């Protein structure tokens, strides 16, 4: 009996610390597949070290121009990519800059069904939030036949959707920025989420779903207001993420200063991209010879 109790409540078991971090409110972090699996193996491999598996050991071979520039250290930070609005198509770019500080959390896993001629086809939809608690946050949604596949896909999509978060002050500009710079509103479906600056020390006054995203974004103090069907967790999370991503959409007076326009990395490192593209294409065309008898 002692072994069974240790397996069920240990760090790697289905009843480990992962459940304690997700709360137990209706439709929330703790009402996912863990309750339906009942220890039959669906909840395994959810720890930090279990995700990724052998894929993390392989060397990253970038397939996009942006990926080649990042791997060759031509782009020094993620902010350079955001400055020129370059689309990020490889999650390894995010891992390259933020890999050590990124934390992810499964917000919800819900079954969805599709009616076919053969009957109902059930798949699982995973909502995953990811952030470094210091100005970067992302949200990923993935649907798959298996829970583990859905979570892995949602983590990759969350990394690709990471946006910078602009922080500001409620009153005097003393200390580090701690709240949203202005009132921002995000919407998804019928859900409308409004973020309002708050004094230092207030904390995040919101429901559990926006609170988790705001904490991952690095916002310490914030008032929130929500309207619509907030019981729909997916729309609630997407509306909050939409509001957070709009913090850089407003040109406030402190950003009115003239800036010097510089070349895009694609223009600045054109010669380097031509060389690396030639080298990569040669490696791909030189296939190993196959012995025939």
Curated annotation (Swiss-Prot):
Cross-linked residues for Glycyl lysine isopeptide (Lys-Gly) (interchain with G-Cter in ubiquitin) are: 54, 58, 275
Q: Where is this region: Disordered?
A: 1-56
**InterPro entries hit by this protein:** Ribosomal_Su5_D2-typ_SF (IPR020568), Ribosomal_uS5 (IPR000851), Ribosomal_uS5_C (IPR005324), Ribosomal_uS5_euk/arc (IPR005711), Ribosomal_uS5_N (IPR013810), Ribosomal_uS5_N_CS (IPR018192), Ribsml_uS5_D2-typ_fold_subgr (IPR014721)
Posttranslational modification:
Citrullinated by PADI4 in the Arg/Gly-rich region. Asymmetric arginine dimethylation by PRMT3 occurs at multiple sites in the Arg/Gly-rich region.
The UniProt keyword set, sorted, is: Acetylation, Citrullination, Cytoplasm, Isopeptide bond, Nucleus, Phosphoprotein, Repeat, Ribonucleoprotein, Ribosomal protein, Ubl conjugation
**Positions of crosslink type Glycyl lysine isopeptide (Lys-Gly) (interchain with G-Cter in SUMO2):** 275
Where does this protein have compositionally biased stretches of type Basic residues?
A: 35-51
Q: Please name the GO terms that the record assigns under molecular function.
A: cadherin binding; enzyme binding; fibroblast growth factor binding; mRNA binding; RNA binding; structural constituent of ribosome
UniProt biased composition (Gly residues): 7-34
Q: Where are the transmembrane segments?
A: none
Swiss-Prot/TrEMBL GO biological process terms: cytoplasmic translation; positive regulation of ubiquitin-protein transferase activity; translation
S5 DRBM domain mapped to chain residues: 102-165
Question: According to its UniProt record, which protein family does this protein belong to?
Answer: Belongs to the universal ribosomal protein uS5 family.
Q: Which NCBIfam families match?
A: uS5_euk_arch (TIGR01020)
| Function noted in UniProt | Component of the ribosome, a large ribonucleoprotein complex responsible for the synthesis of proteins in the cell. The small ribosomal subunit (SSU) binds messenger RNAs (mRNAs) and translates the encoded message by selecting cognate aminoacyl-transfer RNA (tRNA) molecules. The large subunit (LSU) contains the ribosomal catalytic site termed the peptidyl transferase center (PTC), which catalyzes the formation of peptide bonds, thereby polymerizing the amino acids delivered by tRNAs into a polypeptide chain.
- What name does UniProt use for this protein? Small ribosomal subunit protein uS5
Tell me what organism the protein belongs to: Homo sapiens
As recorded in Swiss-Prot or TrEMBL, the protein's gene is named RPS2
